[in-house]
C-alpha cells in the first residue's frame, strides 16, 4: 500500500 494510487 502506497497511500494515493499505489498498490502493494
From Swiss-Prot:
What's the domain of life for this entry? Bacteria
Please share what else the UniProt entry notes about this protein: On the 2D-gel the determined MW of this unknown protein is: 15 kDa.
Name this protein carries in UniProt: Unknown protein 3 from 2D-PAGE
